């Protein structure tokens, strides 16, 4: 699972999800990318499930880059606890994703297999995504 090794503060405010992604919105490393179309939080478990879905489909001969990292803690108080008495413990780690952000990149010689692998990974994520090619961006 992806979590930060060390953080300066255990609990943070919730991040802003409005607006478009300012950076990380072009395919730079691989040939194909998975681009978010909606603002959302993506947890470390969802990132791992999408990575496994890609790797199971392509097996060998390709390379996968994960462009997001869950560096924001989300807290939650236990069920049945009354209001007050401080902020709850960290429940999960999330990556704040804005529309236009490239989540995963991959390079693979077979285009159809690469598209299918990214489609399967997109099914594991909580937002609408689209598949983009490197040559179609510019």
Curated annotation (Swiss-Prot):
Subunit record text: Part of the 50S ribosomal subunit.
Location of region: Disordered: 1-25
Organism lineage: Bacteria, Bacillati, Actinomycetota, Actinomycetes, Mycobacteriales
An MF annotation (GO) of this entry: structural constituent of ribosome
Gene this protein is translated from: rplP
Family assignment from sequence similarity: Belongs to the universal ribosomal protein uL16 family.
Protein name, entry field: Large ribosomal subunit protein uL16
Function: Binds 23S rRNA and is also seen to make contacts with the A and possibly P site tRNAs.
InterPro entries associated with the record: Ribosomal_uL16, Ribosomal_uL16_bact-type, Ribosomal_uL16_CS, Ribosomal_uL16_dom, Ribosomal_uL16_sf
CC per GO annotation: cytosolic large ribosomal subunit
Keyword line: Ribonucleoprotein, Ribosomal protein, RNA-binding, rRNA-binding, tRNA-binding
One of the GO biological process terms: translation
A Pfam family the protein falls into: Ribosomal_L16
Compositional bias ranges of the Basic residues kind: 1-16
């Amino acid at each position: 699972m992806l979590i930060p090794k060390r953080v300066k503060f255990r609990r943070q405010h919730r991040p802003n999800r409005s607006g478009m992604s300012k950076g990380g919105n072009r395919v730079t490393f691989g040939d194909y990318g998975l681009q978010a179309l909606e603002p959302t939080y993506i947890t470390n478990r969802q990132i791992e499930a999408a990575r496994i879905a890609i790797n199971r489909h392509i097996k060998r001969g390709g390379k996968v880059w994960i462009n997001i990292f869950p560096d924001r803690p989300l807290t939650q108080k236990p069920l049945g606890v009354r209001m007050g008495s401080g902020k709850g413990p960290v429940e999960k780690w999330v990556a704040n994703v804005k529309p236009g952000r490239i989540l995963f990149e991959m390079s693979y010689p077979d285009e159809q297999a690469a598209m299918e692998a990214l489609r399967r990974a997109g099914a594991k994520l909580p937002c609408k995504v689209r598949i983009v090619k490197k040559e179609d961006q510019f």
